[in-house]
Amino acid sequence: MLMPKRVKFRREHRGKMRGRAKGGTEVHFGEYGLQALEASWITNRQIEAARIAMTRYMKRGGKVWIKIFPSKPYTAKPLEVRMGSGKGAPEGWVAVVKPGKVMFEISGVSEEVAREALRLASHKLPVKCKFVKREEVGGDANEN
């Protein structure tokens, strides 16, 4: 499971998820990507489930990049505990994902295999996603 090695503070505020993703909105490493269309918290377990679904379908061929990291702790109080008396204990880790963020990238497989692998991965995630391709930036090398 993905989680930070160490953190300065054990608990964090929930924060707001307004606007679109600032960075990581294009496919940089691979040829194909899975882009989020809504904002949500994605847990380390959901990221791992999506990764396993992709790699199993690709029969361990190709390469997968995970471009989100669960660095935010979320807390929960035990069951049947009265309100108050402090914030709960850390329960797990989440990655904050905003619309436009490319979460996974794939290369080394055909487009049909990549499309199906990313579709299977998207079913493991709590956000609507879309399949995106890498866009080549710039023109020919011969142009002046």
From Swiss-Prot:
It comes from the Bacteria. It holds the Pfam family Ribosomal_L16. One of its GO terms (molecular function) is structural constituent of ribosome. CDD domains: Ribosomal_L16_L10e (cd01433). GO terms for cellular component: cytosolic large ribosomal subunit. GO terms for biological process: translation. Keywords: Ribonucleoprotein, Ribosomal protein, RNA-binding, rRNA-binding, tRNA-binding. Belongs to the universal ribosomal protein uL16 family. HAMAP family: Ribosomal_uL16 (MF_01342). Binds 23S rRNA and is also seen to make contacts with the A and possibly P site tRNAs. Part of the 50S ribosomal subunit. This is Large ribosomal subunit protein uL16. The gene is rplP.
